[in-house]
Amino acid sequence: MSESSLPEKLRIRAGVRAALFNAPKGFDAMLDPLPAGATVTASPRGDCDVVLGFVESIAAAVSLVPKLKAALGDGGVLWICYPKLTSARSGELSRDVLWKELSKTGLRPAAMVAIDETWSAMRFVPEP
């Protein structure tokens, strides 16, 4: 069985509208090829199916959450992307820290994926 592509891992499927916030240079190229009809924007209108926010501190994560939520359409997928502890960019963020701090914003973690050797992504869903 082949490994899933990055768009598949991030739930970017055919026809999906995705938004990127603070993505590192070259990240959009990592999403190529996109599934048929999928689009990626840095200027969301509040109707996105998938929203990805890149952060390097807990303060940045907490302050970005309202923008991510505002960009997300009903039933959308919200990802917080952060440097792996094993990467050169690592800092204060980890799965456990994000889980604890973002639960205070009404989000709970649902899944994790590896983006590359530097970045991990945690998917969050609204608390019921």
Predicted features by range, described:
Residues 51-61:
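Short, glycine-rich nucleotide/cofactor-binding loops
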Residues 106-128:
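Class I S-adenosyl-L-methionine
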Residues 38-48:
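Short acidic low-complexity segments
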Residues 34-40, 59-68:
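Glycine-rich, highly charged phosphate/nucleotide-binding loops
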Residues 92-113:
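Conserved Class I S-adenosyl-L-methionine
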Residues 1-29:
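N-terminal, charge-rich interaction modules
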Residues 61-93:
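Mid-chain, well-packed structural core segment of small domains
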